[in-house]
Amino acid sequence: MKKLQYIDRSTNQRVTEVVCYEKTMMFLYTSRLGKGVSTLLSRTPFLSRLYGWIQKRSWTRKKIPGFIKKNRICTKEFKKSISEFTSFNDFFTRELRPEARPIARGDDICVTPVDGAYLIYPNIAEFGEFVVKSKRFSLSKLLGDAKLVEKYASGSVVFARLALFDYHRFHFPVDCLAGPTRNINGYLFSVHPMALKDNFNIFCENKRTLTELKTEKFGDVLYLEVGALNVGSIVQTYTAEKKYSKGNEKGFFEIGGSTVIVLFEPGVIQFDADLLKNSRMGLETRCLMGQSLGRSLRE
């Protein structure tokens, strides 16, 4: 199997990704039998709920030290000590110390909303013609709202993929007035690159939530959280119709991998050059929450 690589933004070096449960992932997404099992798991909500319930049991705490060591997770960033976590899910949804994720300054700067691997498409209209295994990405299916499709069809889109080892709380990328969240029911297919290489429209089929953010510098911004295999719960901690500063927490994903998608209207943001360069090469850029994503083009 071809190794997954990304650019580490902190070093600008190409890195081979450590795949959690690699043998299991290879079985699920590279074999005929495994793909059948994966589809069954993704289309059976009870199994995801059962998995989530298990990860909330106190005895799952014993997995935490080994997981931290294998994935080289920095424990100094944790708000809690390891001994304070009540379950593996409690660890998975951990909070960090505020100083662990400094927020890029400037009211014209949009920041990365999560820790994760980023791909940027500055022109959705061009991306709409992108074909993966003969399957077109559909903005209409993703949003399920004709007015929103028309509004963002010529804008930009950012995909941020969270791995199992990532910090799984998501944050506001800009100063905004946050609207209500709309839930779109769907399946729970994996968003791992092994799955996406066969069908990018997984994002349009999975359970997801959608929130529109009103901003002064970036117009209206559309923010989506996409569930994935074993992630049935997308938890919102913000209050609708309230103003938030960039970097404020919006919510968190419970156990599993997941993705955040952010859409901008046309002509409002100039993305950082390194992110654009890597995306053009088809390489994700691994970023931390709060780093610069781009600058407003509005006066």
From Swiss-Prot:
Protein name: Phosphatidylserine decarboxylase proenzyme
Localization, UniProt: Cell membrane
GO molecular function (one): phosphatidylserine decarboxylase activity
Gene Ontology biological process terms from the UniProt entry: phosphatidylethanolamine biosynthetic process
Classification via NCBIfam families: PRK00723.1, PS_decarb
Residues the record marks as active site: 115 (charge relay system), 171 (charge relay system), 258 (charge relay system), 258 (schiff-base intermediate with substrate)
Protein's gene: psd
Organism: Chlamydia caviae (strain ATCC VR-813 / DSM 19441 / 03DC25 / GPIC) (Chlamydophila caviae)
Quaternary structure note: Heterodimer of a large membrane-associated beta subunit and a small pyruvoyl-containing alpha subunit.
Membrane topology note: Peripheral membrane protein
